[in-house]
Amino acid sequence: MKVLVTGFEPFGGEEINPSWEAVKGLPNEIEGADIIKFQLPVTFSGVREILPRLIVKERPDAVILTGQAGGRPNITVERVAINVMDSTMPDNEGYKPEDEPVFEGAPAAYFATIPVKAIVKALREAKIPAAVSNTAGTYVCNAAMFTALHTIEVSGMTTKAGFIHVPFSHEQALDKPRPSMALETIRKGLEIAIKMVFEDLTREGY
């Protein structure tokens, strides 16, 4: 079994991105499955170019995308990605789309195919604050989630995919009064999420 797990580079003036810091701390193998780690750029063009090539090349059994949601107090598992790019903040290339589709002619939305509620339940049982989120926003995180699910759909693949938002790390919250979480807790949470995806795949006969 093979799982592609991505995090993002820093953006918005931050020196780190807790999503990538947590992802790169994951083991290379979890319960016999290969964990492929990749850092994505915080650019609308980058995720739409890189993710399709990466998914088709690696053909993973699951794709778990992660990103920073500064201000959220818990790990949030996204339910849906929408075909919209709309941002008040430029991406790392200075691009600021307004009411543009991620892909012209693609569906309005895709639901995550990882077990969203089961992941949240497992995280909470491990005493890690977690919740289901019904919006991944309209910035690069949503674009990445939509791109992954659209790529899998048009390629006829059976790969499971979803997105997990993580809070600021404690380091990032030193100078701002915002909710934060220890990087080790975030990393542990991602490992639990991966194991729940394994359970889901096993039940379906992967």
Swiss-Prot record:
Q: Name one Pfam family in it.
A: Peptidase_C15
What keywords would UniProt list here? Cytoplasm, Hydrolase, Protease, Thiol protease
What GO molecular-function term can you cite, just one? pyroglutamyl-peptidase activity
Q: Which reaction does it catalyse?
A: Release of an N-terminal pyroglutamyl group from a polypeptide, the second amino acid generally not being Pro
Q: Which PROSITE patterns match?
A: PYRASE_CYS, PYRASE_GLU
Q: Mind telling me which Gene3D superfamilies this protein's record contains? A: Peptidase C15, pyroglutamyl peptidase I-like (3.40.630.20)
Q: What Gene Ontology terms for biological process does this UniProt record contain?
A: proteolysis
Q: Where in the cell is it found?
A: Cytoplasm
CDD domains documented for this protein = Peptidase_C15 (cd00501)
Q: Name one GO cellular component term.
A: cytosol
UniProt cross-references to InterPro entries, sorted A to Z: Peptidase_C15 (IPR000816), Peptidase_C15-like (IPR016125), Peptidase_C15-like_sf (IPR036440), PGP-I_bact-type (IPR029762), PGPEP1_Cys_AS (IPR033694), PGPEP1_Glu_AS (IPR033693)
Which EC number(s) does UniProt give?
Answer: 3.4.19.3
So where's the catalytic machinery, residue-wise?
Answer: E78, C141, H165
Q: What the protein does?
A: Removes 5-oxoproline from various penultimate amino acid residues except L-proline.
Q: Which family does it belong to?
A: Belongs to the peptidase C15 family.
Task: Identify the NCBIfam families for this entry.
Answer: PRK13197.1, pyro_pdase
Q: How is this protein organized at the quaternary level?
A: Homotetramer.
Q: What is this protein called in UniProt?
A: Pyrrolidone-carboxylate peptidase
- Species of the source: Thermococcus kodakarensis (strain ATCC BAA-918 / JCM 12380 / KOD1) (Pyrococcus kodakaraensis (strain KOD1))
Its taxonomic placement starts with: Archaea, Methanobacteriati, Methanobacteriota, Thermococci, Thermococcales
